[in-house]
């Protein structure tokens, strides 16, 4: 059986641009794409922590080291500059591949600069 599992996420990045009339997608600083193992044109889920919106689009490269997180096209109506986002990617895994599977969790500072990459989500206390 294949299961759709979290592959990676960019945790609490800050939206820098919302470009309604751009062709579409979400431009992400190339350093962050690499840290999260997200390829250009890969589907991503975006969860807006600020307003609760959730939507899917695809990733494109923004200039390396720029800190850019630009939500483009119609999705620009779902995020504004300054909004905090979680950007997640998923992959399908066979059950045998899941032993030891741990998604990449990428953390940033307020300028979307990489601060830490973790390999597991801690257990939430009661």
UniProtKB/Swiss-Prot annotation:
The keyword Lyase applies. GO terms for cellular component: cytosol. Substrate binds at residues 57, 73-75. CDD domains: Asp_decarbox. InterPro entries: Asp_de-COase-like_dom_sf, Asp_decarbox. Its cofactor is pyruvate. Pathway: Cofactor biosynthesis; (R)-pantothenate biosynthesis; beta-alanine from L-aspartate: step 1/1. Heterooctamer of four alpha and four beta subunits. This is Aspartate 1-decarboxylase. It comes from Chromobacterium violaceum (strain ATCC 12472 / DSM 30191 / JCM 1249 / CCUG 213 / NBRC 12614 / NCIMB 9131 / NCTC 9757 / MK).
